[in-house]
């Protein structure tokens, strides 16, 4: 399952890359890289299974979870302000490009450092930074009427706890 799972992620990266590159959709280039790194975390996790290095295995597992948090950050940065503005009929809160990229890039770098067990203090700082940036975004997007809309408050709760998870992991 280790090889097939890794191949799946890398094949998904290739399948996504073809139309994204063809259409020159630069905004989604980072998602292609993230799928590749997701496959890499999957492969390294399975490499640690064979000699059963428990500490390394845990780092590999956490690196994969950090990548999931990065994907949640990427998707959340795109949909939460949009859904909030449309559902509540308010102006959409814009996010600077560096903030939107940080939601995925910081966890992605953190995951790479964790899975190779190198520069772990830097990985921790990246997690703290990603968590704080995402928490700031939750408060920037917040509107008091979110609590009356189940679809919105579930999104906000999920994003909030994902940010806390990155903060605590860091």
Feature-to-residue mapping (PLM):
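Hydrophobic alpha-helical transmembrane segments of multi-pass integral membrane proteins
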Residues: 1-170
């Amino acid at each position: 399952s280790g090889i097939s799972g890794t191949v799946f992620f890398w094949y998904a990266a290739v399948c996504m890359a073809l139309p994204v590159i063809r259409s020159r959709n630069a905004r989604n280039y980072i998602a292609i890289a993230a799928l590749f790194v997701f496959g890499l975390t999957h492969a390294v996790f399975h490499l640690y299974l064979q000699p059963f290095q428990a500490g390394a295995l845990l780092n590999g597992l956490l690196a994969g979870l950090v990548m999931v948090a990065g994907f949640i950050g990427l998707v959340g940065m795109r949909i939460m302000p949009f859904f909030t503005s449309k559902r509540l009929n308010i102006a959409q809160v814009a996010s600077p490009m560096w903030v939107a990229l940080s939601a995925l890039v910081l966890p992605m770098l953190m995951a790479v450092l964790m899975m190779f067990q190198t520069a772990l203090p830097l990985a921790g700082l990246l997690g703290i930074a990603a968590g704080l940036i995402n928490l700031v975004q939750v408060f920037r997007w917040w509107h008091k009427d979110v609590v009356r809309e189940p679809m919105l408050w579930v999104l906000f709760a999920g994003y909030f706890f994902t940010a806390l998870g990155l903060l605590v992991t860091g």
